[in-house]
């Protein structure tokens, strides 16, 4: 079980303690850390919707440190990022791999960044299925559709031609923060807070 630091604040009504993530949520900062899976996606989506209801005109900051994970869970987060009114600024701290990189690139144009030593990795979706031959064929067709959708969205967000994305995601493709910026997955590399 991970330990979560507590923050104590003085208010006019006395002391109030928050876990660090709840305190940062008050500042419109959401952390996406670890594997992208359904429970995490539901929490991220709920936080995005909550912050939109609090102030639909103020940017939301999504900090990403993730090795990737479930495509469907990631798409729930991505679709919500695109759906809500506030811009979602994305920042890679540590790593944004696979679905993490997809979400990083899906931030608002001009508002996607990484810290200088962050790593970004894009690749094609992974899948495995066992069963009857006809069911395996159905799942193979579905993963190819998902691959095409992910590649189209990456092409849109990066400005790269679809054919280049298809080539570059055929195998694991690791990039430094600077390389990810040159590729179009992010807009800037942040060295120091201004």
From Swiss-Prot:
Main location, first listed in the record: cytoplasm
Concerning Pfam families, the annotation shows: CLP_protease (PF00574)
Location in the cell reads: Cytoplasm
Q: Note the SS bond partners.
A: none
Q: Which GO terms describe its molecular function?
A: ATP-dependent peptidase activity; ATPase binding; serine-type endopeptidase activity
InterPro entries reported in the protein's UniProt record: ClpP, ClpP/crotonase-like_dom_sf, ClpP/TepA, ClpP_His_AS, ClpP_Ser_AS
Group of enzyme by EC? hydrolase
EC no. given is 3.4.21.92
Q: Which reaction does it catalyse?
A: Hydrolysis of proteins to small peptides in the presence of ATP and magnesium. alpha-casein is the usual test substrate. In the absence of ATP, only oligopeptides shorter than five residues are hydrolyzed (such as succinyl-Leu-Tyr-|-NHMec, and Leu-Tyr-Leu-|-Tyr-Trp, in which cleavage of the -Tyr-|-Leu- and -Tyr-|-Trp bonds also occurs)
Q: Which GO terms describe its cellular component?
A: cytoplasm; endopeptidase Clp complex
Q: Where's the active site on this chain? A: 98 (nucleophile), 123
The answer to whether UniProt assigns keyword Hydrolase to this entry is yes
User: What's in the keyword line of the UniProt record?
Assistant: Cytoplasm, Hydrolase, Protease, Serine protease
Q: Which GO terms describe its biological process?
A: protein quality control for misfolded or incompletely synthesized proteins
- What does the protein in this record do? Cleaves peptides in various proteins in a process that requires ATP hydrolysis. Has a chymotrypsin-like activity. Plays a major role in the degradation of misfolded proteins.
Q: Which family does it belong to?
A: Belongs to the peptidase S14 family.
Assembly and partners?
Fourteen ClpP subunits assemble into 2 heptameric rings which stack back to back to give a disk-like structure with a central cavity, resembling the structure of eukaryotic proteasomes.
Name of the protein: ATP-dependent Clp protease proteolytic subunit
């Amino acid at each position: 079980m991970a330990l979560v630091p507590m923050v104590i604040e003085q208010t006019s009504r006395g002391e109030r303690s928050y876990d660090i993530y709840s305190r940062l949520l008050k500042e419109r900062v959401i952390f996406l850390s670890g594997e992208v899976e359904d429970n995490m996606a539901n929490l991220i989506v709920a936080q995005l919707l909550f912050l939109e209801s609090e102030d639909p005109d103020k940017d939301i900051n999504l900090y990403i440190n993730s090795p990737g994970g479930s495509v469907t869970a990631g798409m729930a987060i991505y679709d919500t990022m695109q759906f809500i009114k506030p811009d979602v600024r994305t920042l890679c701290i540590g790593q944004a791999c696979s679905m993490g990189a997809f979400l990083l690139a899906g931030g608002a144009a001009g508002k996607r960044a990484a810290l200088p030593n962050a790593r970004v990795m894009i690749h094609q979706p992974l899948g495995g299925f066992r069963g009857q031959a006809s069911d395996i064929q159905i799942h193979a067709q579905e993963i190819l559709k998902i691959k095409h959708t992910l590649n189209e969205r990456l092409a849109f967000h990066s400005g790269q031609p679809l054919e280049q994305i298809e080539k570059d995601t055929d195998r694991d493709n690791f990039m430094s923060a600077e390389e990810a910026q040159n590729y179009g997955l992010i807009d800037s590399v942040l060295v120091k807070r201004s």
